């Protein structure tokens, strides 16, 4: 995997390993490739294309020093799993150290991260352990509302984002604050707000890494995305903070109405000395955690559903197989629920292939850095080196996937037509290693249930004369550039 092309070396560390380690291929800022890295539109495709030229590990010059890009399953797994104690601190970027994002679990490190993760995980586990039947009822109610709107609009094409995002947000509001959206929440809801965050983060980070004399020019090109990232993230924080304060007014310790109450209890379980020493408290444990539930749960759930419905419409032969399985297992008188999931291997395989092929999580939602000097496949990486982790490259890694650019749901089935655990073990839509998404189980439930119920109720198609468009808007999560489909009721 080492690249022998002539390239500049990383700046010297306090350890003199020049004669012992190979040189990491380096891309200067002023080079054509460096300019593409900073100015190009499709960032996930750019870093992937650079790996074809420089190898699966390379560095890029920035105004704040070199940043190392890791590509391919071997390097990403080595960093995030085998050396998870090294590749696990937040990069020293201003964009990661300001509110509200600095309060997110994803952007913490060390003992602060360990304490936050432990109490957050316990709260999630305790909340969900006895509520799955209720949660399924809540989800089905929201899906029925989506179906009513789509049936009423008739034979017109549409983007499913409005109803899917709105009803998913309402469902999560119920989980977090024990109430569905009311008329006021519906009236102010902006279904596009979360879609701006993935691309806005990438551009906010690149803006910060630009030389000062070029930042104004960069802002002229990408300022709209940067501003919407900031305003929508702050809006999400304000929404969560308002509801946390409202719930706190009548919170009674030991009485649990919703996830918010479990997080109040989690915050109370951390002693004052620990809170002071680690700079952790209600803003992190309650508000930060719920903001991630609302943002990641609502955003990724909606992004995944737009992709999944688009793929159903784009590949009618696969849609027919999904619906045949749903009809045989569920029938007309029931709706797909968690109890049916094990008997729906093709439906699960279709979802898994959608998440792989669209590469929904193209990179972690934050830039990490090395906590100490380390070697990766013989390459020396100094302490404090920021990283770009290219998850997209895993979905296109030819050592893992045959014909990775093709959409083939059957790749996730074994010879007996059952879901292949081996193939599932190669796909990481929720990340891998210590930083793997804490809400993975809940996220998978949301995506599977939404998809299965909507695919059971509707047949989706591309409007006549319209070309299939599977292009993504680049970001830490990949969002469909355009979804324009029709939905015909099946039941």
From Swiss-Prot:
Superkingdom of the organism of origin: Bacteria
GO molecular function, one term: steroid 17-alpha-monooxygenase activity
Binding site for heme: 437
Stored InterPro entries: Cyt_P450, Cyt_P450_CS, Cyt_P450_E_grp-I, Cyt_P450_sf
EC number: 1.14.19.-
GO BP term (any one): progesterone metabolic process
Keywords: Heme, Iron, Metal-binding, Oxidoreductase
Cofactor dependency: heme
Effect of deleting the gene: Deletion of the gene abolishes formation of the dimeric compounds 3,3',5,5'-tetrabromo-2,2'-biphenyldiol, hexabromo-2,2'-bipyrrole and the hybrid bromophenol-bromopyrrole pentabromopseudilin, whereas the monomers 2,4-dibromophenol, 2,4,6-tribromophenol and 2,3,4-tribromopyrrole can still be produced.
Protein family (similarity comment): Belongs to the cytochrome P450 family.
Function as written in the Swiss-Prot or TrEMBL entry: Cytochrome P450 protein involved in the biosynthesis of polybrominated aromatic organic compounds. In the presence of ferredoxin, ferredoxin reductase and NADH, catalyzes the coupling of bromophenols and bromopyrroles, forming various polybrominated biphenyls and hydroxylated polybrominated diphenyl ethers (OH-BDE). Can also mediate the heterocoupling of 3,5-dibromocatechol. Can also use chlorinated phenolic substrates. 2,3,4-tribromopyrrole could be the physiological substrate.
Name of this chain's protein: Polybrominated aromatic compounds synthase
Lineage of source species: Bacteria, Pseudomonadati, Pseudomonadota, Gammaproteobacteria, Alteromonadales
